Design a protein with these regions (language model features):
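RNase H-like (RuvC/DEDD) metal-dependent nuclease/polynucleotide-processing core
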Residues: 1-4, 8-172
Length: 172
């Protein structure tokens, strides 16, 4: 098995982070790209074929016309108090109609998006992930780390939050 992580922007203007990891979880390569074609070019043949788990930080399956998906409601019920909730996604939003960007990539690469399909050596699966709730849980945090750009956040404060997260990885 090997792994791909995609911090997928909902549109093709903002940057998307892409990382490829080997079977032991070591980083092989990473990049920041914008378009689906750039993602395909970066990943190339490493993201095709069996034995691959692709973790995508973006909605993959969006059947609802309005409001939130049940998974978003569930995440928000448990993680809102940690400032680690999920944004709502629905087909009324242009980014998800007719199809979410993550689903388009999964189809392009042949990744199975069915959440009932277990990862295996003879298949490649794409799973939707929620990094902020994962960080809160894995590192036993009182709130999500504020390492992204935002109102009132300085470069120094964001750097400190990111270093805190990275230091926590040694303990996880």
């Amino acid at each position: 098995m090997h792994y791909v992580g995609i911090d997928l922007a909902w549109g093709q203007r903002a940057r998307t982070g892409v990382a490829l990891l080997d079977a032991s979880g070591r980083l092989v390569s990473s990049s920041s790209v914008r378009t689906d074609d750039e993602i395909v070019e970066f990943l190339g043949d490493d993201a095709r074929g069996p034995g691959l788990i692709v973790a995508i930080d973006a909605p993959l399956i969006v059947p609802n016309e309005a409001g939130q998906r049940p998974c978003e409601r569930e995440v928000n019920a448990h993680f809102h108090r940690f400032h680690a909730g999920a944004y709502p996604s629905n087909r009324g939003m242009a980014a998800f109609n007719p199809q979410p960007r993550g689903a388009r990539l999964a189809l392009r690469f042949g990744w199975d998006m069915d959440p009932r399909t277990p990862p295996a050596e003879d298949t490649s699966v794409a799973i939707e992930v929620y990094p902020h709730p994962a960080m809160v849980t894995l590192f036993d945090l009182p709130r999500v780390l504020k390492y992204k750009r935002g109102r009132g956040r300085t470069v120094e404060s964001r750097r400190n939050e990111l270093l805190h997260a990275m230091n926590g990885m040694d303990d996880a």
